[in-house]
Regions:
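Short beta-strand element of Class I
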Residues: 10-18
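Class I S-adenosyl-L-methionine
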Residues: 18-188
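Conserved small/polar residues in nucleotide/adenosyl-binding loops
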Residues: 1
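Short helix-capping segments at alpha-helix termini
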Residues: 5-10, 34-37
């Protein structure tokens, strides 16, 4: 696909991959060398501390666990990414603190509480991106039979921040007793 963009469209493409697992990075770099992708680089590290670029056109995350998704989304906003495609994973942060007595029929059951926390987290993430000038959608990107973690947050930069979206996240956060990392990162 990268070659098609370069050859057919004339785009100057550079792709950077980050992962915390050394063996994954080594394998990806071996593939890069084998197939001659000179503008494709993989680095071992955390996106929160990555300083290799000032701006990007697109950020893609796949199953960045818990708050790693938040750090990636915040970095994408900071870099001014035109497009963000994010497949979140295990949203433990909200699950640890979420509470609301009126929702006890859900909160009293671990699996339901976990799923509710995941939905609330991803909804808040989408709204926070809207508050920073992105048009967002949450889509099912692959059939449930392949993975239960099949939601994709798609965000396209419009440059029109939505203050109401931020208020909605504030209200939900207060009601459910959650304080999401992405909200804090975007406030800095």
């Amino acid at each position: 696909y990268k070659r098609q963009l370069k050859v057919l469209k004339g785009y100057n493409i550079r792709i950077i991959g980050l992962d915390l697992k050394k063996d994954v990075i080594e394998h990806c770099n071996q593939l890069r060398t084998r197939y001659g992708y000179d503008k494709l680089d993989f680095y071992e590290g955390d996106i929160a501390s990555y300083k290799g670029v000032e701006s990007v056109d697109m950020v893609v995350t796949l199953h960045a666990c818990d708050t790693a998704t938040d750090y990636a989304l915040a970095k994408a906003v900071k870099w001014g990414a035109k497009v963000i495609l994010s497949v979140p994973c295990c949203q433990h942060e909200a699950n640890r603190t979420i509470a609301d007595e009126t929702l006890s029929p859900v909160m009293d059951y671990g699996i339901l509480k976990e799923r509710f926390a995941a939905i609330a987290t991803d909804g808040a993430r989408a709204k926070l991106l809207e508050s920073k000038g992105y048009q967002t959608q949450i889509l099912e990107f692959i059939d449930m039979e392949h993975t239960p973690k099949n939601l994709l947050i798609r965000a396209v930069k419009t440059g029109k921040p939505d203050a109401k979206a931020y208020e909605e996240v504030q209200n939900m956060s207060r009601m459910l007793n959650i304080d999401l990392t992405l909200k804090k990162l975007l406030e800095d």
